[in-house]
Amino acid sequence: MKKKIMIIGGTGFLGYYSAKLALKKGYEVASISVLDDDLVNKDLSTWFPKEIKNTIIDVFSASEEELTKAMKGYDYMIYSVGPDDRYTPKAPAYEFFHFRLVDSCAKCFRAAEKAGVKKAVVFNSYFAYFDRVHPELKLQEKHPYVRCRVEQARLLNEQKKNMEVVVLEFPYIFGSMESRLPIWRDVFLDRYVNGHKTVFFSKGSTTMIAVEHIAEAAIGALEYGKDGERYPVGDQNKSYKWMLEYMSQCKGVKKKVKLPPTWLCVLGAKAIERGFHKQGLEGGLDYALVMKEVMSIDLVVEPEVLDKVCEELHIGRGGLEEAIQKTMDRCYPNPGDFK
């Protein structure tokens, strides 16, 4: 008999790839989704796999009982619902992220356990990993988003009784899907890169991965992940300079990427934050502190850790450049869109 997986957020970017891989590996797959405003084509019949039963439920407002009923009969659950750190909500940011990342997620996990789900995976952030291995940075104290990610993992493991819980901590992710525009365009590329002959950015490095390997991590966590474990997932460590130059190169544009002193990057970040505050917004990350303490250094998941996690969860490697190309082509499909 086929094992059955319920994916919360199956029409989202990461959930969609996880669902497709689960089908390919012979699982019976179902999805619970919110048809949010970011979904370009809400007619699922034209692009979403017909083998996947999709139910539209707002997991943030739904009752625990409603969610339990929806997950009855499933062996596994993958929770692929954001928001991530790139979303800037109305202040206070902590309340926004806590409700969505902690309260609502914990509700879904309780419902899954009541429904008889044996093992569940949550998509978390590599900021939680950095908070764990670099306590001197005090990331969860300074950034509401990081605090909520740490609280999410802690609560899911504290409240469980018989259901196994595996936490995946994700880095920068590249790739594309037909019915969504990559969030890269609105929150990053159009703001800081597109239309600028010279791009000023921070001198540090980060960890990156192609979305196909995120799907492998999700299924690998169900098949091989240890209960209670937190796995930092990634493929390659690259500098921001390389990333910006390669993204531009993908659209045939050569840009100068200059690395100004950190204090100048901090001033730029403070200007962005002032703009947010005037609109009553607050980021989940303190951008000035991120520029000063995170993006100005090579804050990466160590290669030996990446190797160990990829081996344990059976995650493939490579394809980063191709995934960046797909991202850029989806963001800017027409000649001249990216300058």
Q: Where are the language model's segments positioned?
A:
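Conserved Rossmann-fold NAD(P)-dependent oxidoreductase catalytic core, especially the SDR/UDP-sugar
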Residues: 103-148, 166
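Terminal hydrophobic/aromatic helix or amphipathic segment near a protein terminus
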Residues: 245-299
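NAD(P)H-binding glycine-rich loop region in Rossmannoid oxidoreductase-like domains
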Residues: 52-103, 107, 129-131
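Non-catalytic, hydrophobic alpha-helical segments
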Residues: 14, 77, 214, 218, ...
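Oxidoreductase cofactor-interface core, primarily capturing Rossmann-like NAD(P)-dependent enzymes
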Residues: 136-229, 234-236
